Swiss-Prot record:
The chain crosses the membrane at residues 520-540, 548-568. Its EC number is 3.1.3.64. Residues 1-519, 569-586 are cytoplasmic. One of its GO terms (cellular component) is endoplasmic reticulum membrane. It catalyses: a 1,2-diacyl-sn-glycero-3-phospho-(1D-myo-inositol-3-phosphate) + H2O = a 1,2-diacyl-sn-glycero-3-phospho-(1D-myo-inositol) + phosphate; a 1,2-diacyl-sn-glycero-3-phospho-(1D-myo-inositol 4-phosphate) + H2O = a 1,2-diacyl-sn-glycero-3-phospho-(1D-myo-inositol) + phosphate. This is Phosphatidylinositol-3-phosphatase SAC1-A. GO terms for molecular function: phosphatase activity; phosphatidylinositol-3-phosphate phosphatase activity; phosphatidylinositol-4-phosphate phosphatase activity. Residues 121-450 form the SAC domain. InterPro entries: SAC_dom. Keywords: Endoplasmic reticulum, Golgi apparatus, Hydrolase, Membrane, Transmembrane, Transmembrane helix.
Length: 586
């Protein structure tokens, strides 16, 4: 495999960027013309002494905004750990540098738009969870890497990366098109990685979780649900648990993703908007596309649908069950488990019902395992695909339980655990295990819903606590605010970053300029004024109590009526995406 360079210096002159590879023995320099935007390969001797020099950790890519092209570089990284001798890094800080020396050629409106687009790019970059490795392919599971051809293994990291999980693929299009430049860049995944040295029975082993978020149908909680026409599911995450001991290694893979047919749940100021199933689309076609690709990549599928089997979630569960049954595909099995009903009144021990119900299937699927001499001992023949409404809180709890069961078998087979010993009895490791899975839940939740996960007290401690309920309430309030009043901007940021929307410098007006209806401006003002007057009348009583009551009732009714009108027209008051028209299923 052609590794990427690991250390760089960026030399900037008014005319060009010179990105110097600083690895031992390297003589290559990537030259970017700031006027023509052309990229070429040169040598160290071509770097002019007049340039301003700074060290950088890597090239994220380039993006076109209103002012022209911008170079995105990684300026700070933090070591996560070593994966089979390869250092895994977390990208911590970035810099977005304009090719143009000035933006004075722009109009005031263009300057404002460019500033907004820059804020969007930085919004995504500041979302925690970007990881990379310069000499190892993080986009693939252990099993996929094991089953590759010699030709595949000779490819550069950019050529061989799984496009589903390469979040800077759009930003690197120009570099990818020139193979001689491939060593100057690497795939960056988005999600979560934790690597922990652990010890049981005096035997030290490495335990790892890698969660890879798909960049297909990527987005935020309420604006991206279901699937697209290609069968890509919203909030699709591949989670791989890896254990290494004495050069032997094993991995267990699970997936999560939105219920894979066409439905939506647009924010409308209500705490829980009603999900709507599309009446005008071919659900079976989309469902088949989704599961055909899943079976091709992962083998047999066991769907664990954890949504409520009552209320607004019931139609989704019924439709999903009916569609899977209609497929008549022997590689796909459907299991519905009403998580909230089964675990109501703090009865979290009832999760074991589901774990026991799928135990035979988990035994059948197995896991990928390689002996210390490199021989493949077993492969994973199927995958559990878990989902709830968001594929976050309930999903993560179930995934952690299934992963523990797989790990129990792997550690016994490797000789770390004695026969009859259970992971749950190893207090030190159990604490590491639970906290890591809770951290995984928080990372996935922040990236999709904007806050940490719910129910992480159970993941961390093995039991539900009253403090955990309080924190869930707080996170739910934060989610409500973000989902209604800031997620449109967050969705636009992701669409711009991934190339779902491309800025055209020749456009005089961008989609950012959407005129708001008069109701959007006037009604909130009326409501605030009416409510304020109601409070003032309560505090400053009139001459008689009847006069005071009349004023309070008048202003109270005015504020209540205005609030009702706002709620009825809720979708006009939420922060909606502007750049890419999202499907409306209603």
């Amino acid at each position: 495999m052609a590794n990427a360079y690991e250390r760089f210096n960026l030399h900037s002159t008014p005319e060009k960027f010179y990105i110097e590879a600083c690895d031992d023995g390297a003589d290559d320099v990537l030259v970017i013309d700031r006027v023509s935007t052309e990229m070429t390969l040169a040598g160290i001797k071509d770097i002019p002494p007049s340039g301003i020099t700074r060290p950088i950790c890597g090239v994220m890519g380039t993006v076109r905004l209103v002012a022209g092209m911008y170079l995105i570089v990684i300026t700070r990284k933090r070591k996560v750990g070593d994966l089979f001798g390869h250092t895994v890094w977390k990208a911590v800080e970035f810099d977005v540098i304009s090719y143009k020396k000035t933006i004075l050629h722009l109009t005031d409106i263009q300057m404002q738009d460019n500033k907004t687009f820059l804020t969007m790019i930085n919004n995504v970059l500041n979302t925690d969870g970007f990881y990379f490795c310069t000499d190892y392919d993080l986009t693939h599971t252990q099993q996929r890497l094991s089953n590759t051809s010699p030709d595949f293994q000779e490819m550069s990291l950019l050529e061989r990366a799984d496009q589903r999980f390469m979040w800077n693929g759009n930003l690197l299009r120009e570099i990818i098109a020139q193979p001689e430049l491939h060593k100057f860049a690497f795939p960056v995944i988005h999600g979560f990685i934790v690597m922990k040295p652990c010890c049981i029975n005096g035997k030290v082993f490495e335990w790892i979780i890698i969660s890879r978020r798909s960049c297909f149908r990527a987005g935020v909680r309420y604006y991206v649900r279901g699937i697209d026409s290609e069968g890509h599911a919203a909030n699709f995450v591949e989670t791989e648990q890896i254990v290494q001991f004495n050069n032997a290694r094993a991995s267990f893979v699970q997936t999560r993703g939105s219920i894979p047919f066409f439905w939506s749940q647009r924010p409308n100021l209500k705490y829980k908007p009603k999900p709507l199933i599309s009446k005008d689309t071919n659900h079976m076609d989309g469902l088949r596309r989704h599961f055909e690709s899943q079976v091709l990549i992962y083998g047999k599928q066991v769907i664990l649908n954890l949504v409520n089997q009552k209320g607004s979630e019931l139609p989704l569960e019924q439709a999903f069950a009916k569609m899977v049954s209609s497929m008549e595909n022997g590689f796909i099995k459907y299991i519905a488990f009403d998580f909230h009903k089964e675990c109501s009144k703090m009865r979290w021990h009832r999760l074991q019902i589901l774990v026991d119900a799928v135990s035979d299937m988990q035994e059948e699927f197995g896991y990928f395992m390689v002996s210390s001499d490199g021989k493949v001992l077993s492969e994973q023949s199927g995958t559990f695909r878990s989902n709830c409404m968001d594929c976050l809180d309930r999903t993560n709890v179930i995934q952690s339980l299934l992963a523990r069961r797989s790990l129990q078998s792997q550690l016994q087979r490797m000789g770390v655990l004695h026969v009859g010993q259970k992971i749950e009895e190893q207090a030190d490791f159990e604490k590491i295990y639970k906290n890591a899975w809770a951290d995984n839940a928080n990372a996935c939740a922040k990236q999709y819903a904007g806050t940490g996960a719910l129910k992480t007290d159970f993941t961390r401690t093995g039991k539900r606590t009253h403090w955990g309920l309080v924190m869930d309430g707080w996170n739910s309030m934060i989610r409500y605010y973000k989902n209604n009043f800031s997620d449109g901007f967050r969705q636009d940021s992701i669409d711009l970053f991934l190339g779902n929307y491309s800025v055209d410098e020749t456009d005089s007006l961008t989609p950012l300029h959407v005129k708001k209806d008069w109701k959007f401006l006037l009604l909130p003002v009326i409501m605030v004024v009416a409510f304020s007057m109601c409070i003032i009348c309560l505090l400053m009583a009139g001459d008689t109590w009847t006069e005071t009551l009349a004023y309070v009732l008048f202003w109270g009714m005015a504020s209540a009526l205005t609030a009702a009108v706002i709620v009825v027209n809720g979708r006009e008051f939420v922060d909606a995406p502007k750049l890419v028209q999202k499907e409306k299923m209603d």
